[in-house]
Amino acid sequence: MDSYSIIIKPHVTEKTMNLIDKNNEITFVVKRDANKGQIKRAFEELYEEKVARVTTHITPRGNKVAFIKLVEEEMAEELAVKIGVF
């Protein structure tokens, strides 16, 4: 799968904004059939940042959301500004 087809868009809510500040995690809506390894590789390829872990869940609306924890502190906030979340 292509990296651009795996990661669809940032998932922005009040909760995800708090995760950026407190847990160094950023969230994205991803392709439903993508697994954690594919999501990690796609994120590292697109944004050139190291990933510590990926957790996922499927929302009641049927969207798959990936919570991506970054290795370096403060990188999630900088990345969010870079991609236009803030």
From Swiss-Prot:
Keywords: Ribonucleoprotein, Ribosomal protein, RNA-binding, rRNA-binding. The keyword Magnesium does not apply. One of its GO terms (molecular function) is rRNA binding. InterPro entries: Nucleotide-bd_a/b_plait_sf, Ribosomal_uL23, Ribosomal_uL23-like, Ribosomal_uL23/eL15/eS24_sf. The keyword Ribonucleoprotein applies. Disulfide bonds: none annotated. One of its GO terms (biological process) is translation. GO terms for cellular component: ribonucleoprotein complex; ribosome. HAMAP family: Ribosomal_uL23_A. Binds to 23S rRNA. One of the proteins that surrounds the polypeptide exit tunnel on the outside of the ribosome. Belongs to the universal ribosomal protein uL23 family. Part of the 50S ribosomal subunit. Contacts protein L29. NCBIfam families: PRK14548.1, uL23_arch. This is Large ribosomal subunit protein uL23. It comes from Methanobrevibacter smithii (strain ATCC 35061 / DSM 861 / OCM 144 / PS).
